[in-house]
Regions:
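Active-site donor-binding loop signature of nucleotide-sugar glycosyltransferases
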Residues: 15-17, 195, 271, 455
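Active-site core segments that coordinate phosphate-bearing ligands/cofactors
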Residues: 32, 91, 98-115, 120-157, ...
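A generic structural motif
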Residues: 15-16, 85, 284
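Short beta-strand-loop/turn "lid" adjacent to the catalytic site in phosphate-handling enzymes
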Residues: 48-85, 113-119, 148-169, 192-196, ...
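N-terminal glycine/serine-rich phosphate-binding loop of ATP-dependent small-molecule kinases
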Residues: 1-80, 108, 136, 208-209, ...
Length: 483
């Protein structure tokens, strides 16, 4: 995405890369080279569509998926495919850390519990199960930082993304010596820490040639997809909250201090804004639930429209509440609020009366119910929720927007910029280039609300009743999947 000095999108491009491989249940791997290859195709297209010259680019920003473990050898070669964010094979390593350090001490040290999704547990798994690969590991990076390393030669990471490694002292914004020593990780293998708008490198010869950018163009640290997406949606001060549905689903709130949920059911990370933090809940398989249905059962007759548009149009034929049909979106285990990698998805209440439309709508409602679990925890923690902004695929669909307003029982807003993480990364680059003095100033100047959706009073009651039933499903099925 190319942004001008007024915050307008001058041009953008996307390029697909190979989806993750899942050779066993709970595994998820990608090849880092695929990310770089896609970047090398997308960036020149975006520059061409923006009709700008390489010398017109003042600064480059970054965002990308969090938690993934990219391991390089001494010469910079990828040791093995990256274990990405939704890989949950590492539950034994999570338990090992918890037993060794103690659950309370873990949260005190990192503001988070040890979860299978976090980077450290993935490193521990490789060390235990692939010792020959582990012997080769010299450098450890996260996904977006691998791409930046390819174009700058600098090993760097921002505070927000580093928060999801389980190696950062989140409260003090530095690597945790306690965690490094407990896990046996050499700090010298980790990237240097930067605040998100800070310049951490410049485009090198490889990057200039591959991307069509000017040699020496400054590059900022950027942020993981959630913090960057929040910046792109203006979620930078307490009270404004986002609910974003991508492959995963996230409810995100900015805070002026580290806000801890005692049970570790919410993540507390550094924000992309210096001196600020955020608290968020995560649904593992939000948009992934709808993609799973599409891949397994199809999107209906191909009439030239986007398959997801066809699916949501079909879902609109079913009534709100789906006549009692419920979907729990636990296809990849679940984080918030269960912290259970063994949780499994379920359709509950299926009858001969139900149709494909009911099932699709139940998936849309079930994902919204899962996100509502985070709002319930926010309420318990006294985290202010004055405005809710929607992002991702859940903001593009008129039906899913309305379902979320009805499930949350709250007016929701949709901002103009649809690609929140890319837009946020560009804003961070603008701050790094000096276009704006701060992230707050930039968001106030360029983030604009395009529309609002109000809850339907007659439907809110139906959703409240179904949500109460939804909350009972996990407890009723947990023992079935525990083994």
């Amino acid at each position: 995405m190319v942004l001008d000095e007024h915050g307008r999108v001058a041009g953008s491009a996307t390029e697909e890369h190979a989806p993750f491989a899942s050779p066993e249940i709970g595994w998820a791997e990608q090849h880092p080279e695929d990310w770089w290859r896609a970047c090398c195709l997308a960036v020149p297209k975006a520059l061409e569509r923006a009709r700008v010259r390489p010398e017109d680019i003042a600064c480059v920003g970054f965002s990308g998926q969090m938690h993934g473990a990219v391991m390089l050898d001494e010469r910079g070669n990828v040791v093995r495919p990256a274990l990405i964010w939704c890989d949950v094979r590492t539950n034994p390593q999570s338990q090992e850390l918890t037993e060794k350090i103690g659950a309370a001490q873990l949260i005190q040290a990192t503001c988070n519990p040890a979860l299978a999704n976090f980077t450290l547990t993935k490193l521990m798994w490789v060390r235990e199960h692939e010792p020959e690969n582990w012997k080769r590991v010299r450098w450890i990076m996260l996904p977006k930082d691998y791409v930046r390393w390819r174009m700058t030669g600098e090993r760097a990471i921002d505070m927000a993304d580093a928060s999801g490694t389980l190696l950062l002292d989140v409260a003090h914004r530095r690597w945790s010596q306690l965690m490094l020593e407990a896990a046996g990780i050499d700090e010298r293998s980790l990237p240097a820490l930067f605040e998100s708008p800070d310049v951490c490198g410049k485009i090198n010869a490889e990057g200039a040639k591959a991307l069509g950018l000017r040699l020496g163009t400054p590059v900022v640290a950027g942020a993981g997809d959630q913090a960057a997406g929040a910046v792109g949606m203006g979620i930078v001060v307490p009270g404004t909250v986002s609910a974003t549905i991508g492959t995963s689903g996230v409810v995100f709130a900015a805070t002026d201090r580290p806000a801890l949920e005692p049970g570790g059911r919410l993540h507390t990370f550094c924000h992309a804004i210096p001196g600020r933090w955020h608290v968020m809940g995560v649904t593992q398989a939000a948009g992934l639930s709808l993609r799973w249905f599409r891949d397994q059962f199809g999107a209906g007759k191909d009439d030239g429209r986007d398959p997801y548009e066809r699916l949501t149009d079909e879902a609109a034929k079913a009534p709100a509440g789906c006549q009692g049909l419920l979907w729990t979106p636990y296809l990849m285990g679940e984080r918030t609020p269960h912290l259970d990698p063994n949780a499994r998805g379920a359709l509950v209440g299926l009858t001969a009366t139900h149709t494909r439309a009911h099932v699709i709508r139940a998936i849309l409602e079930g994902v919204a119910f899962s996100l509502r679990d985070t709002f319930t925890l926010f309420d318990e923690m006294k985290v202010a929720v004055k405005r809710i902004r929607l992002g991702g695929g859940g903001a593009r669909s008129a039906l899913w927007r309305q379902i979320q307003a009805d499930v949350y029982g709250h007016e929701v807003e949709i901002v103009e910029a649809e690609e929140g993480a890319a837009y946020g990364a560009a804003i961070l680059a603008g701050v790094g280039a000096g276009m704006w003095r701060s992230v707050d100033e930039a968001c106030a100047a360029v983030v604009r609300v395009a529309r609002t959706v109000r809850p339907q009073p007659d439907v809110v009651g139906i959703m409240n009743a179904n949500y109460a039933s939804y909350r009972r499903v996990y407890a009723a099925t947990k023992s079935i999947f525990a083994s």
